[in-house]
Amino acid sequence: MKKIYLLITVGFTALSMNSCKKFLEQPSVTKYDSQNIFETVDRAEMVVVGCYSQIFNRELYYQLGMGTDECMSTESTSNSKNQVGNYVYTPSISPSSTFTAMYAGIEYANVAIKGLQGMSVSDAQKPKLNMLLGEAYAIRAMNYLNLIRFFGDVPYSTEPVGETGQFSSSRVNRDVIYDGCIKDLQTAAGLLPWKSAGMVPTYERFTKQAALGILARVALYAAGYSLRWDLNTYSAASVKIAQRPDASRIKELYKIAADACKQVMDKGENSLLPNFETVFRNLITSKYDNESMLLFGQWGQDNNDSQVGYTNGIFAHASCIYGKSQPAMAVTPTYWYDFAAGDLRRDVTICNYGINADNGRDMNTYSSNTIGKFRVNWGPNTGTAVNKRDIDWPILRYSDILLMYAEALNEYNNAPTGEARAALEQVRTRGFGGDASKIGVTPSDYQGFRNAIINERKFEFGFESLRRTDLERWGILYETLTKTKQNLNEMAGVTGAYANIDRYRVYKRTIATSFQDAVVAVPYTGYKTLTPADSTTMAKAGNVVLRMHNASILNSQGTLAPNNALISNLFRGLEREKVEILPIATSIIDVNPGLKGQQHPKY
């Protein structure tokens, strides 16, 4: 009898053609004889579907999604999530859930790949077997990407631990891992069907276009900057931000990224929805669309642990009709003003109100705006529970294909081509409601276009857990966050670029009455100055007069004043050529002898 592997079995739920009813229930962990589980394609499919439970977790958008020019923590400075979100790392508090989850998924994928490769099936079953094998390759590669994004060089294995008997593994050069991931994703793309083939029932599983999109993402990271050190000496003096040393391979990687995106674009199965708002209303109400290309499924009591919409949503009072939503993440105040006038993405991405106990919409002040993309009042109901809202996580959207394509062409050619400009403009025009006259002039030089991409990704993917490591792969994390903190002080003091911002906003309070709420933002009139008499008159007329630098009455993060605690605590651990990569948690090193002496050299 062959070795016993730890596998995951999965039960399927019914699928709806127009609704994203979840394709999996919570897996139950069971021991199976590997010979028996891979006897039939249907049994093997359970193993592959089980891999998806370990491709994402809350840490990826929570601790590791904060600390950017978009997002900050709302928790106390003594809280480990706040510390990680502000670059106050130590090996004792370094996030470990992502590390262990990604390796669990890799082990499941390795088991699946080995088992599937050993199967003999009929010609009629071969396409499905290929699809399953492609999924396993893609999952393994994506999990390694998430490990490298945050931990740099990590242990690397493509064989099941149960097969090799190796429970000790050292760090492997990330360039070797990236090249392995690219090979895996190229293999996956060759095996997987397009969504239109009808074989993949949901965007919560890999299709050919999803594999190509993740291939492009991996290639851009592999070509980009990262914090590196000498893996022979682990000398602190060797730590530096750099690209991989082989310039020809870097150029090849940009071509790989561009070509992968072009395949998706040329196929024509995916497209931008006309309205940015619809993307997230569909997500929250579990509807499929052609823009969402890969989602992490959340449904029911057992497979719903990411707390999307609860940890990273708007504030909703426990007594309101929507049930409690208690965000532990807030909007970096300057982000609001980063958006250009007329960019409709701002009010979808940033919610300017919370829901009080009486269901009233109370406007937020600058310090307390919340994440709007996953707001609970847009859902069809409360969901499974207030902290299990049944909201999928968006891993890949078509707009990312367009922006990665534009970026890769600019890097490959050292200047934007016409195709690169057109791809960027397609995303930007949608952001302005389809009005191309509002998007401004697209730069035609390399650096100007690169800066445009850096900004556009901020506007398009706010709070989708891409910004932090995007800034790192561009080599500008420290510089961007240092500038953000300077801007925040100017905003607090109403000086410099923020000299003419609103000090007051006046609005009418309205009452929410149902789920699938049509409201996007509370309308207001902004004022630079208001006399006490004017304020009194407006209040008597039924308006609320809000001092924008004061604390909010809901989800308060305190006042916004120059150099106060809100500002001084933000990014307080930031240190160039140190915090771009996290230390590996002590608890992980303790159980892996291969990592002894291989901690991040500056920790």
What are these regions (language model features)?
Residues 36, 41-42, 48, 52, ...:
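Elongated scaffold/linker segments in the mid-to-C-terminal portions of large proteins
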Residues 137, 212-218:
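TPR/Sel1-like alpha-solenoid repeat signature
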Residues 158-161, 171, 226-255, 393-397, ...:
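Acidic, serine/threonine/proline-rich low-complexity intrinsically disordered regions
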Residues 3-5, 13-40, 181, 216, ...:
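Bacterial Sec-dependent N-terminal signal peptides
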Residues 148-150, 155, 196, 218-230, ...:
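Short coil/turn linking the two alpha-helices of tandem helical-hairpin repeats
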Residues 61-74, 193-210, 224-314, 434-452, ...:
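Short, surface-exposed recognition loops and adjoining beta-strand edges that mediate ligand/DNA contacts
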Residues 72, 160-164, 262, 422-433:
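Short edge-strand/loop segments of extracellular domains
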Residues 39-49, 53-57, 79-151, 165-201, ...:
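Conserved, well-structured interaction surfaces
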